[in-house]
Amino acid sequence: MQFKRFLALGDSMTEGMSDVVFNGKYRGWADRTAEVMAANWPDFTYANFAVRGKLVGQVVRDQIPMALPFIEGRSTLVSFHAGANDVIRPKYDPNKTIATYNEGVDILTRAGATLALFCVLEDTGAKTRAAKVWQERFAIFNENVRRRAASVG
């Protein structure tokens, strides 16, 4: 499918934090993907709304409303990655985080966009107590992402 537009929503993973620095700015996977798409598809447009450190509720509340006016059906690709910053918090509430994530997916699906959803690395290889807790949390979170991805195609 040829996309007319790519909208990137989320946190540091999508913003490009800690990726290649170009002219003093991060240039992450979303920027590089958009560059290739723009080179191959005429009249292609791109916007990256992602901001490092954002929680899933902030992405749903702040970024999705900004992106909605730019969605023009299935020809708009929207990447949605949020929730990892919630998962690593001491007072993580899996039910709330997953429900909010699902709300974001539902809003974007109703808008008619083609969605790209992403899982988080579950096992970093670290053997600390915190790493074990995060692995368990991310496994549950990722299972929800996989279910939602399957449900929206």
Feature map (PLM): residue ranges:
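Serine-esterase "nucleophile elbow" of acetyl-processing enzymes
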Residues: 1-52, 65-74
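A short linear-motif detector with a strong N-terminal bias
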Residues: 25-28, 57-58, 136
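Alpha-helical cap/lid subdomain in secreted, periplasmic
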Residues: 41, 62-153
